[in-house]
UniProtKB/Swiss-Prot annotation:
Belongs to the HMBS family. Binds 1 dipyrromethane group covalently. Its cofactor is dipyrromethane. It comes from Xanthomonas euvesicatoria pv. vesicatoria (strain 85-10) (Xanthomonas campestris pv. vesicatoria). The lineage of its organism: Bacteria, Pseudomonadati, Pseudomonadota, Gammaproteobacteria, Lysobacterales. This is Porphobilinogen deaminase. It catalyses: 4 porphobilinogen + H2O = hydroxymethylbilane + 4 NH4(+).
Length: 304
């Protein structure tokens, strides 16, 4: 009996995603025993400050990667939007699963849409990307930092601290909370984080046995889209310090990639898009990034 150990964060959403991967692996590999190794990460523990202030989304990975290096786990499951653009050696992503809903969700107990929010409404989100698009759509809103897992954020809304909050649709759907979605915020008017809605499995690239076990879960069409989005972000030197959005979709045999850079302070948004080959997602990402630079993205990013 072969056993595969999956390192995972302890949040309900992370555990759901890891169990989803585990179930798929058991289906593909009858006889494979898959166990979860839940771990706490610095990103989960430091909830009093924004991610940008404490070092970025890579904080969600480091402890899981250390567990793999120490031989305590064979792989780790992540929301791909939390994975840095460049992985440290020897880590690789053998599997990116079929993408879930990439859109954002406005969640409110009183108001059915972004437009329905009253003047000066209090909206919770710590994402600079979401803040920039909220400021562009509704400059009057009071935007307030909001950290914690999905259930924690919903509890803060329900306790009256906010008129609305913005979360990822995929997270709510995976936790059976789709009924909490008041309005979808989606492309082309509203762009998600690069790779939002996609789950990735990480392992050591020097472990061929584990790599081959995981690679059967890879969804090629999803990988092409999210690699184009991440290539654009990489070309912009983006991180959670920077309000960057990207969304790629298949059109015929190729991809259509939309990108955005914004200002969370005043709501200025710069958009660019391009069609390209799914065989060269890096080139497509760089082309959209260059389109953003041509429209003044470098100056906007320099102000952050």
């Amino acid at each position: 009996m072969t056993t595969l150990r999956i390192a995972t964060r302890k949040s309900p959403l992370a555990l759901w995603q890891s169990e989803h991967v585990a179930a798929a692996l058991r289906q593909h590999h009858p006889g494979l025993e898959v166990v979860l190794v839940p771990m706490s990460t610095r990103g989960d523990e430091m909830l009093d400050r924004s991610l940008a202030a404490i070092g970025g989304k890579g904080l969600f990975l480091k402890e899981l990667e250390l567990a793999m290096l120490r031989g305590e786990a064979d792989c780790a499951v992540h929301s791909l939007k939390d994975v840095p653009m460049e992985l440290d050696a020897p880590f690789v992503l053998p599997a990116i699963l079929e993408r879930g809903d990439p859109a954002d969700a406005l969640v409110s107990n009183l108001y059915a849409s972004l437009q329905a929010l009253p003047l000066g409404a209090r909206v919770g989100t710590s994402s600079l990307r979401r803040q920039a698009q909220l400021r562009a759509a509704r400059p009057d809103l009071e935007l307030i930092d909001l950290r914690g897992n999905v259930n924690t954020r919903l509890a803060k809304l329900d306790n009256g601290g906010y008129d609305a909050i913005v979360l990822a649709c995929a997270g709510l759907q995976r936790l059976g909370l789709e009924a909490r979605i008041s309005a979808r915020l989606d492309a082309p008017e509203w762009l998600p984080a690069p790779a939002q809605g996609a789950v990735a499995v990480e392992c050591r690239g020097d472990d061929a046995r584990i790599y081959s076990l995981l690679a059967v879960l890879d969804a090629g069409r999803t990988r092409a889209c999210v690699e184009a989005e991440r290539a654009m972000n990489r070309a912009l030197h983006g991180s959670c310090h920077v309000p960057v959005a990207a969304f790629a979709r298949w059109e015929g045999q190729g991809l259509f990639l939309q990108g955005m850079v914004g200002s969370a302070s005043d709501g200025r948004l710069i958009h660019a898009d391009a069609h390209g080959s799914a065989e060269d997602t890096e080139a497509l990402g760089r082309r959209v990034a260059q389109g953003l630079f041509d429209k003044g993205a470098a100056q906007l990013l320099a102000e952050l």
